[in-house]
């Protein structure tokens, strides 16, 4: 959606990744209610996923600092959607009609919203910014996770004791600076539609190269660890780091296919709308592919790791995730399979040693 204002300021042209339709009000109300019901289920899914990932720690703290905010940022995306719904249903009144806007970008004057001023559109502009920021936070976020894994592989000798929180903090600040800059650039059309593709076109090859590098390095480490005649000594934390990197790659491979499927569906849908292959009301389905991405990406992450999967299946079916802290906590010890028990013991021992090394 493109908004052009008659004001002569540098912010007179606005580009928003939102859609509006010319539909009867009762139809819009029904669609919005259905969307809100599905979003509530999605909110529950995101809550449970974050709860499980934080409860069952299987990865290094630095990876958590970088990866979890990416999943948590879905909340800002859905806030942007709620703002859009409020404008669609005219809960936020305007002195003019917004009309139909189903093109992600256009230079056709007939499809551009012309207004005397941006008064009354401030919340819609803010919602559009949140959606732009979410998209590019994922693009740059994936790259920062790849860089963090490369650093973890290269500095395997003393990664935990020397880096602590400084390295992920720097990566997080850089990625957010780039994400916010791109979001503002697109919002005020300082970045064109072609330039908007450059970040993911650059990020994807670098991330793939990092993936291949980390895979080869850690598979080499694993072979060396299993070699009884090796001369190099691997500490418990280093062995854990190798296993963690390979576990991340296993999860990352599945997430890559999930994200690529998500991008492919969105891309094909936008192209179909642009070339009028499908009617404009199909835009409801296409835009919700973005808003409901946790059903694909979140479930892929939760179901790819046995420990997460077990806890996720238990928690997702109950609304009561957090227990009253004043109640006594009863620990139930269950007999588990040897492989899983060994993993848990090794993980707990590693984090105890790691915590002692940081004191």
Swiss-Prot record:
One CC-aspect GO term: membrane
Descriptive protein name: Serpentine receptor class epsilon-33
Keywords: Membrane, Transmembrane, Transmembrane helix
Annotated family: Belongs to the nematode receptor-like protein sre family.
Compartment(s) where it occurs, according to its Swiss-Prot or TrEMBL record: Membrane
Keyword match Transmembrane helix: yes
UniProt KW Hydrolase keyword: no
Ranges that cross the membrane: 29-49, 65-85, 134-156, 168-188, 194-214, 255-275, 285-305
Species: Caenorhabditis elegans
GO terms for biological process, alphabetical: sensory perception of chemical stimulus
Organismal lineage: Eukaryota, Metazoa, Ecdysozoa, Nematoda, Chromadorea
Domain of life: Eukaryota
Bilayer disposition of the protein: Multi-pass membrane protein
């Amino acid at each position: 959606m493109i908004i052009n204002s008659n004001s002569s300021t540098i912010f007179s042209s606005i580009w928003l990744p939102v859609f509006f339709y010319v539909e009867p009000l009762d139809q819009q109300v029904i669609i919005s209610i259905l969307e809100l019901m599905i979003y509530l289920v999605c909110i529950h899914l995101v809550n449970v996923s974050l709860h499980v990932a934080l409860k069952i720690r299987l990865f290094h703290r630095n990876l958590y600092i970088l990866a979890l905010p990416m999943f948590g940022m879905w909340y800002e995306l859905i806030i942007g959607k709620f703002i859009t719904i409020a404008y669609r249903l005219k809960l936020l009144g305007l002195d003019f009609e917004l009309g139909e806007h189903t093109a992600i970008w256009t230079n056709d004057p007939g499809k551009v919203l012309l207004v005397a001023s941006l008064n009354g559109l401030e919340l819609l502009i803010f919602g559009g910014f949140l959606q732009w920021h979410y998209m590019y936070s994922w693009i740059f976020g994936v790259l920062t996770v790849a860089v963090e894994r490369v650093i973890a592989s290269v500095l395997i000798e003393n990664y935990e004791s020397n880096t602590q929180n400084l390295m992920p903090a720097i990566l997080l600040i850089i990625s957010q600076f780039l994400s916010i800059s791109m979001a503002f650039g697109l919002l005020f059309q300082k970045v064109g539609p072609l330039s908007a593709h450059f970040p993911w076109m650059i990020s994807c090859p670098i991330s793939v190269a990092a993936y291949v590098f980390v895979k080869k390095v850690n598979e080499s480490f694993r072979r060396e660890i299993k070699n009884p005649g090796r001369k190099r000594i691997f500490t418990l934390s280093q062995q854990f780091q190798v296993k963690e990197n390979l576990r991340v790659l296993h999860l990352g491979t599945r997430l890559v296919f999930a994200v690529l499927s998500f991008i492919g569906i969105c891309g094909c849908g936008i192209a179909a709308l642009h070339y009028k292959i499908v009617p404009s009301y199909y835009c409801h389905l296409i835009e919700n592919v973005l808003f409901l991405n946790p059903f694909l990406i979140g479930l892929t992450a939760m179901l790819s790791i046995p420990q997460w999967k077990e806890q996720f299946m238990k928690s997702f079916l109950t609304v009561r995730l957090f227990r009253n802290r004043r109640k006594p906590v009863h620990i139930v010890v269950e007999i588990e399979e040897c492989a899983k028990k060994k993993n848990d013991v090794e993980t707990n021992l590693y984090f105890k040693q790691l915590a002692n090394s940081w004191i």
